């Protein structure tokens, strides 16, 4: 039985930190689940990491459903949350509910969407139809990246007060958790102490109730963007490139495949074949 939304909520009550990994494919998600990660997040960052887009804007619902289906087949233990991509929920509450339902049908247990107070009514409507929602405030890649760029949020009193208000209104709307992206660590701590919903930090300091990293960042597999907050636990890209170079050299030198890598005929059958074809 995999973790439930209530299990994640209870972790904050029990003062236990929540581990979240963003992943997009069956193979790596299987390993994350095996490692005991609490939450698997299928992020719209798949657009950059898996599809090579410059940002998350082009990601579609069909793509998010595909990635969600792949990860859902891999998990046995973790809670599965999936991102609603750009313009899948902003235009109308009806869109938000319908598209949230698509992600649930694809295997998600909950959805995540960006936005503060302005999205409270939408979140409430999604929750009212029985779909759990994770909020996302601070840096919001779908929107703030278009206007403000990649900047830390909550460094002034006014911006901090707005973030705190956003968090309170999201909690009132019914979110079970709130992602805080690139929020100053002082403000992230205040929010974490103010709301009962677990906060999940993305570059927002150690005092959040949990943390999230993209698995490719953690493993050192994605070099296009290297955010300050992404700790690398290994540099797998170097090992992968070296292994591929070794394979190429083995092919060129005719040392791969070796005898243990191929299959053979029965010697008597081979003899008959050679006699028949005259070789």
UniProtKB/Swiss-Prot annotation:
Where is this gene product found? Answer: Cytoplasm
User: Per UniProt, where does Mg(2+) bind?
Assistant: 44, 83, 114
Catalytic positions are: 181 (proton acceptor)
Q: Which GO terms describe its biological process?
A: coenzyme A biosynthetic process; pantothenate biosynthetic process
Q: Which organism is it from?
A: Nitrosopumilus maritimus (strain SCM1)
Cofactor or coenzyme needed = Mg(2+)
Which pathway features in its UniProt record? Cofactor biosynthesis; coenzyme A biosynthesis
User: Per its UniProt entry, which superkingdom is the organism in?
Assistant: Archaea
Using the UniProt record, give the first listed, main subcellular location.
cytoplasm
User: What keyword terms does UniProt attach to this protein?
Assistant: Coenzyme A biosynthesis, Cytoplasm, Magnesium, Metal-binding, Transferase
Cellular component, GO, one term: cytoplasm
Q: Under which name does UniProt file this protein?
A: 3-methyl-2-oxobutanoate hydroxymethyltransferase
Q: Which Pfam families match?
A: Pantoate_transf (PF02548)
Residues annotated as binding 3-methyl-2-oxobutanoate are 44-45, 83, 112
Gene3D superfamilies with a match to the protein in the record: Phosphoenolpyruvate-binding domains
């Amino acid at each position: 039985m995999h973790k439930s939304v209530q299990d994640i909520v209870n972790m904050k009550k029990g003062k236990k930190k929540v581990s979240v990994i963003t992943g997009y494919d069956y193979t790596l998600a299987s390993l994350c689940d095996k490692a005991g990660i609490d939450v698997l997040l299928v992020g719209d960052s798949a657009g950059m990491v898996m599809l090579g887009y410059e940002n998350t804007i082009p990601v579609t619902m069909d793509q998010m459903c595909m990635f969600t289906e792949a990860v859902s087949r891999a998990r046995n233990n973790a809670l599965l949350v999936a991102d609603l991509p750009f313009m899948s929920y902003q235009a109308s509450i009806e869109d938000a509910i319908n598209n949230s339902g698509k992600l649930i049908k694809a295997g998600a247990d909950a959805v995540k969407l960006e936005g503060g107070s302005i999205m409270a009514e939408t979140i409430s409507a999604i929750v009212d139809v029985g779909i759990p929602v994770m909020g996302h405030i601070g840096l919001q890649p779908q929107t703030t990246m278009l206007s403000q760029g990649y900047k830390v949020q909550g460094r002034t009193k006014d911006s901090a007060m707005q973030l705190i208000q956003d968090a309170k209104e999201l909690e009132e709307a019914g979110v079970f958790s709130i992602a805080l992206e690139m929020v100053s660590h002082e403000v992230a701590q205040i929010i974490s102490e103010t709301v009962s919903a677990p906060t999940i930090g993305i570059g927002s300091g150690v005092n959040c109730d949990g943390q999230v990293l993209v698995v490719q960042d953690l493993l050192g597999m994605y070099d296009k963007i290297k955010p300050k907050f992404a700790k690398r636990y290994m540099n797998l890209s170097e090992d992968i490139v070296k292994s591929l170079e070794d394979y190429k050299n083995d092919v060129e030198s005719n040392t791969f495949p070796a005898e243990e890598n191929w299959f053979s005929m029965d010697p008597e059958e081979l003899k008959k074949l050679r006699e028949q074809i005259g070789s």
